[in-house]
Regions:
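Residues forming well-ordered secondary-structure scaffolds
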Residues: 87, 105, 126, 143-150
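N-terminal strand-loop-strand beta-hairpin
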Residues: 1-114, 155-176
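Residues forming anionic-ligand binding surfaces in small-molecule and nucleic-acid pockets
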Residues: 65, 122-132
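Short beta-strand/turn micro-motifs at beta-sheet edges
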Residues: 117-120
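A generic structural motif
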Residues: 134-139
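Mixed-charge, glycine-accented linear interaction segment located at domain edges/termini
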Residues: 140-163
């Protein structure tokens, strides 16, 4: 699966009324607690990959993300599977993987047609908006990305507002 994703900084109180007006439906609220891992043999910050255990509502999901595929969005291969978070972390630690950092956020999730809209309140960082389309085929990347930017234009947002820095990088930058 390829996630086609655009992230922007956004005041949620300005976004919510527009979402309501366009008839977007709320599909969930998640308290996400993410731990990112660093491999002993490869610097994921340099290779632009990610290895993460996400804990939410009593269960955990393991995620691999590949390098970003374009210059304007956060489009990339994403592989996810449910796991036992505690056991998986123990396995990683045993193999010499270190924790690179943690990100905690509250995510309000909406659906507007095919587009998944996330209102993220990230601990220590503030409010963000992420919009996402998942595609199977690389040939659909460009049209999906265009669709996301067209969607964002309804909020007065454009390509120049797109942030490609990850929450983890922002958390780490703030810490240093
Ligand atoms: P998702 O969209 O899957 O819910 P998210 O929105 O919580 O994730 P993002 O900021 O979109 O978080 O993506 C996580 C990011 O963390 C990835 O872009 C990845 O490249 C980055 N990352 C992972 N490991 C490292 C590392 N060691 N150093 C710097 N960045 C990393
Ligand atoms: Ca995503
Ligand atoms: Ca994201």
């Amino acid at each position: 699966m390829i996630e086609v994703e655009v992230k922007v900084r956004a005041d949620h109180s300005k976004i919510r009324p527009v979402l309501m007006e366009m008839g977007a439906s709320k599909i969930g609220v998640e308290e996400q607690s993410d731990v990112y891992f660093a491999a002993p043999y490869r610097d994921f910050a340099k290779t632009d990959e990610a290895l993460r255990i996400r804990s939410l509502g009593g269960h955990s999901v393991l995620t691999y993300k590949g390098p970003k595929l374009d210059k304007v969005s956060k489009t990339r291969v994403e592989i996810e599977t449910p796991v036992d978070g505690t056991a998986t972390a123990k396995i990683f630690h045993s193999l010499g993987f270190l924790e690179a950092g943690a990100v905690r956020k509250k995510r309000d999730i909406f659906r507007a047609g095919e587009i998944i809209v996330c209102l993220d309140a990230v601990e220590g960082l503030g409010e963000f908006l992420e919009v996402e389309l998942d595609v199977e085929d690389k040939k659909d990347l460009e049209s999906s990305r265009a669709e996301l930017f067209k969607f964002l234009s309804q909020f007065g947002l454009s390509e120049k507002d797109s942030i490609r820095t990850s929450y983890l990088e922002m958390v780490l930058e703030k810490r240093n």
